[in-house]
Every structure is written in structure tokens, then in C-alpha cells.
Amino acid sequence: MAAVGRVGSFGSSPPGLASTYASGPLANELASGSGGPAAGDDEDGQNLWSRILREVSTRSRSKLPTGKNVLLLGEDGAGKTSLIRRIQGIEEYKKGRGLEYLYLNVHDEDRDDQTRCNVWILDGDLYHKGLLKFSLDALSLRDTLVMLVVDMSKPWTALDSLQKWASVVREHVDKLKIPPEEMKEMEQKLIRDFQEYVEPGEDFPASPQRRATAAQEDRDDSVVLPLGADTLTHNLGLPVLVVCTKCDAISVLEKEHDYRDEHFDFIQSHIRKFCLQYGAALIYTSVKENKNIDLVYKYIVQKLYGFPYKIPAVVVEKDAVFIPAGWDNDKKIGILHENFQTLKIEDNFEDIITKPPVRKFVHEKEIMAEDDQVFLMKLQSLLAKQPPTAAGRPVDASPRVPGGSPRTPNRSVSSNVASVSPIPAGSKKIDPNMKAGATSEGVLANFFNSLLSKKTGSPGGPGVGGSPGGGAAGASTSLPPSAKKSGQKPVLSDVHAELDRITRKPASVSPTTPPSPTEGEAS
């Protein structure tokens, strides 16, 4: 009891202890001196200091504990660091190497107390698994929560990743050589927490003292149900949380890889079976869409610090699933199997959820533009090597009339006949009325030409060449006037005869066939 006396002496007591009880429930007794040596009652003084020690220990127990740890395991690129940084509220960060250390600030508003939760992130390469000895040892084993992170943008790796990292934890725990009695106690605690899970209600107490009392009463009154055949068959003695990240990629899997709802139900059923074997919880998250990030933090502090949470299980939304440890069982997982249409329950995960074929990305060769002068010199050399006939189309030197059609000389007709290709059998037939129309046009042309020639040959009329008395034929001026007058009568008779013939046969010209100017000029 001498030690108690030394602690009770304010001269030698720590300043924190004196300041703690300056306004405590025993302040009046200390101020009145009823517990001091001047009272002369040693027994009452010893009882007083015993009460002080008990209250100090009670207050120390009511504060938030320190030394709690979260260990994150998963493949490279699964989003482990991104998840913790988002919980911390940090946008920009740098990924560590090997074993990364972070922390979470934990604040209890009811107790007005805060502490830090240690976060260890192991590299995705198995080469670094030896670093687990710095984050998970025999002393910190009881205060550690294991978080297995799965990348849902690559669901074909989900099951293998979970089994691989769970085996890494099991191997490391076995190397710690924990006494069997202590390990058995940790396993039994995990089983008890799984069996005593209760759906969160609205009347859940908020005060820490009331929480502890209510939890103890629930444990005393509740009936513990036996575990299922596949439940906690791989008990690590540690609370486990499975976090599926990048769940926003579910829509991409539907569009690009033809995933359907039954595929996602199939994936979820296998992950939930794994969680049953290890007694783990399951949360689907998305850092990109900030989905269920706060839920991960709330579940961590609930498991490590006993904070309450009022969030029930969510299984309806395929990209925001939340299944706390102790809620799930084989019957609830069987509900997912009812939606299977083309899949079967006994199908292997690797046979259904396969890795899509890798599309080879062909890198196009970067082309550097040449100098303009070098390019023009190469082009000039290429043009110089080509023969002149191949440089372009031969120019048509035949003369053209104002209408646009070339006039072919008569002398070249015979030479060009051999070069004309034969007319195909399916070409358009020649209109038989075209010849008759061309003949009548020729007659009309001859008729009007004769009129012009006769008119120019009349006395006093201008000649063709512009000289008076000049006709189409030079001999017309030498004829006597009597001969000219006698020649006019046959011309008039020819005009009347021609007009009568045209009037009697108007249908000889085809109305649909346009006159050929080439033939008229030739006649």
C-alpha cells in the first residue's frame, strides 16, 4: 500500500492525473481534505485513493483504443491506394512500393475522442509478401482487420485473386506460431460474432455505455443458430472484408463483352460463397462514382472500435452490393440461382467467366513529312522515267464545229473504218424513218439553193461575190434576157410541184427523230 500512498501524493503525481480530477466527482472530497493525512483515518484515505485508481482505469477503458490496423491485399491496379485515399478525402496521391503505410482519422462524437487507425497496403507482387512481418505480428493480430480488394473490371480474376491472397494470410499467420489456446479463442470470437449478427434497427443505442449494455443483453437473450455446412470452414481468426472496386465497369462489360444479369449474379454467388467460408463481409464500391466509400469506413470502425451502423444488407443493386458478416447463408445465395437461364449452378467459374481475347493493337508507323524540294525532285525523276505516251491522253487534233461535234474529213473516213469497234448486239435499233427524213431535207435544201441561185442571176441583182450581175455561175451573165425570162417559168412550176408533194406526204418525216445536221450539210 506504500505505492498507493506515493501515487496519492500530489507532489509526485503526474500533472495529467491532477488536472483530470480537478473537476471530477471526487473534487469536493479532495478539497475538504477528508481523504488527506490530516484526517487521521488511514483506512478512509486508502479507500479514497482506491476509488481514484478505479475511476482512472475506467476512464482509460472508455477512450478509443489505439493500435488498430487494417491490412489491404490485392492485385496491382485493383485500386487499394485509391480506395484509402478517397476515404481520407485526398484527390492527388502517389502510389507506394512494397509495403505502404497510411492512416485513417477516427472520431467518436459521443465520447468527444479521436484516434488513428493504421492502414497497411501490401504490393500486388507476391515477391513482397515477406514484408507482412512489419504489419502483422503476434501482438497486433487481435487488432487487425484484413481487407481483400478485387478488381471488378476484370471479373475473370476475382476468384483466383481472393483465394491467392487468403492463402497468403493463412501462411503468414501460421508462421507467427500463435499458441493454440489463443488462436482457438480468436476463432471462437469470430464464430460468435458471425452467429450473433442482428439486423440494425432504429432503436439501436447511441451511447457507448448503453451500446455495451445492450449488446450484452442481446447476447444473453438471443438464440445462437448453428453454422451452415460451408460457413467459416476457413477460419483465420481475423475479421475479413472483401471489397470489389471499379464496379462502374459493369456497364462496360455489358456493352463490350456481352455480359448479362445472370453473369453478374453468377459472379456474386461465387464471391459470396467465398465470404461464407472465411466469415467475411462484402462491399461493392466505385471510387470513380464515389459509391459505398463511406460504407467501407463505417464498417471498419464498427468492426475495430464497436461503432454502430444502421445500414442493412443491399443485394438488389448489382453495382452497390453490401453484405455484412453474419447476414448471408446458402439459402440467400440460392435466390441468385433462380435467375439463371443459360447458366447452371454446378458450372465452373473459370469456364463461364473467361478472359476475353486480347485485341492486338497495331501501332501505326509514324511518317515524317519530307522537305518540299526533296519531294518535288523525286516526283520529277519519276515523271522523267515514264514514256511520253503514258503521260496523258492523246490530244484530238480534229477540227470542231460551233455545235461541239468534230468535223471528220471525207478522206479520213476510209482510214478510220478499221478502227471502229463493232456495235454490240444489244445496242439501240436504227429508226427506219430517219432515211426518209434526211432525203426530204436534202430535197428542200436543193430547192432553196436553186431559188437563191436563180435570184442572184436576175438582172440588176447583186452577185454572190458582191459585184453587180455576178451569179453563182459565171456564165449566167452572158445569157440573153429572153433566155432568163424563159427560165423563170419552169422554176415557179418546180416550186408549186415541190410544195404540193410536201403537203401530200407530211408523215414521211419521223416526228421523234431529230434532223441530222451532218447529213443535210453533206447533201
Curated annotation (Swiss-Prot):
- Residue spans with biased composition (Gly residues)? 458-473
Protein's job: Acts as one of several non-catalytic accessory components of the cytoplasmic dynein 1 complex that are thought to be involved in linking dynein to cargos and to adapter proteins that regulate dynein function. Cytoplasmic dynein 1 acts as a motor for the intracellular retrograde motility of vesicles and organelles along microtubules. May play a role in binding dynein to membranous organelles or chromosomes. Probably involved in the microtubule-dependent transport of pericentrin. Is required for progress through the spindle assembly checkpoint.
Sequence ranges of Low complexity compositional bias: 412-421, 474-483
Q: What are the subcellular locations of this protein?
A: Cytoplasm; Chromosome, Centromere, Kinetochore; Cytoplasm, Cytoskeleton, Spindle pole; Recycling endosome membrane
> What lineage does the source organism belong to?
Eukaryota, Metazoa, Chordata, Craniata, Vertebrata
Q: What is this protein called?
A: Cytoplasmic dynein 1 light intermediate chain 1
Q: Which gene encodes it?
A: Dync1li1
Give the record's keywords alphabetically: ATP-binding, Cell cycle, Cell division, Centromere, Chromosome, Cytoplasm, Cytoskeleton, Dynein, Endosome, Kinetochore, Membrane, Microtubule, Motor protein, Nucleotide-binding, Phosphoprotein, Transport
Kindly list the positions at which Phosphoserine occurs in this protein.
Answer: S207, S398, S405, S412, S419, S421, S427, S486, S510, S516
UniProt-annotated binding residues for ATP: G74, E75, D76, G77, A78, G79, K80, T81
PTM comment text: Phosphorylated during mitosis but not in interphase.
Q: Where is this region: Disordered?
A: 1-45, 387-434, 457-523
Q: Please give one Gene Ontology molecular function term for this protein.
A: molecular adaptor activity
Phosphothreonine sites (modified residues): T213, T408, T512, T513
The annotated subunit structure for this chain is: Homodimer. The cytoplasmic dynein 1 complex consists of two catalytic heavy chains (HCs) and a number of non-catalytic subunits presented by intermediate chains (ICs), light intermediate chains (LICs) and light chains (LCs); the composition seems to vary in respect to the IC, LIC and LC composition. The heavy chain homodimer serves as a scaffold for the probable homodimeric assembly of the respective non-catalytic subunits. The ICs and LICs bind directly to the HC dimer and the LCs assemble on the IC dimer. Self-associates.
User: Of which family is this protein a member?
Assistant: Belongs to the dynein light intermediate chain family.
Which Gene Ontology cellular component terms are annotated? centrosome; cytoplasmic dynein complex; endocytic vesicle membrane; kinetochore; late endosome; microtubule; recycling endosome membrane; spindle pole
BP terms from Gene Ontology: cell division; cellular response to nerve growth factor stimulus; early endosome to recycling endosome transport; microtubule cytoskeleton organization; microtubule-based movement; positive regulation of mitotic cell cycle spindle assembly checkpoint; regulation of centrosome cycle; regulation of vesicle-mediated transport
Q: Which SUPFAM superfamilies match?
A: P-loop containing nucleoside triphosphate hydrolases
